[in-house]
Amino acid sequence: MSHAAYARTAQFSSPREVEAQTLLMAARKLVEVQTNWNGPDKKMQAALLFNRRLWTIFMGAAESNDNPQPLEVRQNILNIAIFVMQRTIEMQTNPTPEKLQPLIDINANIAAGLSGRP
């Protein structure tokens, strides 16, 4: 999502909905790579980079002293983010389409929770 598109979305949606939509966008990019697997290519690298940047933002927010979430919630976010980073490194060093599935599932499940959807 371009910065302009993100800004437009942010104007009309709650922060939770923006986060959910961005997680779904990351999941779609990863699904596209997995479905059209050609080995490690530019699309894989771009999808992993987008996902890693997103989770880096979540990590920063969870670590912030200004974050109003309970400590346990923040710690859970950090634990998930650490897993995402580790899996991303695994994908970059020994890529297989199967290793993308946990990243896809995490993003989709958290997006559903943020949106209030099962």
Task: Give the label of every model feature segment.
Residues M1-I57, E63-S64, P68, R74-P118:
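N-terminal intrinsically disordered, cationic/polar leader segments
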